[in-house]
Amino acid sequence: MAPLPLCFVTSSKKKLAEFLHAVGDNTIAHVSMDLPELQGDPETVAREKARAASRIYGGPVLVEDVSLCFNAYKGLPGVYVKSFLTAVGPSGLCNMLLPYEDKSAYALCIYAFCDVTVDDKPALFTGRADGRIVPPRGPQTFGWDCIFEPLEGGGKTYAEMEMVEKSAISHRGKALEKVKAFLTNSGVKVPCVK
């Protein structure tokens, strides 16, 4: 049986859109898979998600895990940002920092590549964007984009940017550049990578 092509695993349509924008529309297989929300540091969470997804898919996968880290909270909500967003929304996240002068934060994206048919040691590709938390601005259509103003963003939140502008400076865009370099040089069966 021929090896399976690389599959990007996500249940988020917005993450998928940004991923396909970066690597080329419809060039990599993708599947929606609800993986368990794990606890731990960002690297451990990404590794375990990749292993689990590769076991289910039966071949090479790429998964993404994102953290939003408030410096005033020593890195929280971090990998738990999805749970915080579900509970309190973007405004609630922003309000967590009301008692603090320090509104600085960083966004962290980790892509993990794993193929359990070869080995179970995921390769990690990390991107980070420093910025600050601001009251919601722009469309509230993708997670916490409307409250994160990256230092490189010219005073705009991610939500106020076009995808091309955001991808050039975002945590996800920085991590994806590393993923593209890896895929270009790895020999992994990928139909096409821009």
UniProtKB/Swiss-Prot annotation:
Write out the similarity annotation: Belongs to the HAM1 NTPase family.
Question: Which EC class, in a word?
Answer: hydrolase
Q: What is this protein called?
A: Inosine triphosphate pyrophosphatase
Which organism was this protein described from?
A: Giardia intestinalis (strain ATCC 50803 / WB clone C6)
Keyword annotations: Cytoplasm, Hydrolase, Magnesium, Manganese, Metal-binding, Nucleotide metabolism, Nucleotide-binding
Give a GO cellular-component term: cytoplasm
Q: How is the cofactor bound?
A: Binds 1 divalent metal cation per subunit; can use either Mg(2+) or Mn(2+).
Annotated binding of Mg(2+), by residue: E37
Tell me what reaction this enzyme catalyses.
Answer: ITP + H2O = IMP + diphosphate + H(+); dITP + H2O = dIMP + diphosphate + H(+); XTP + H2O = XMP + diphosphate + H(+)
One biological process term in Gene Ontology: deoxyribonucleoside triphosphate catabolic process
Instruction: Provide the E.C. number(s) assigned to this enzyme.
Output: 3.6.1.66
A GO MF annotation of the entry reads:
metal ion binding
Complex formation: Homodimer.
Q: Where in the cell is it found?
A: Cytoplasm
Q: Would the keyword Membrane be found if you checked this record's keyword annotation?
A: no
Per UniProt, ITP binds at 10-15, 49, 65-66, 82, 142-145, 166, 171-172
Q: What is its main location?
A: cytoplasm
Cofactor list: Mg(2+); Mn(2+)
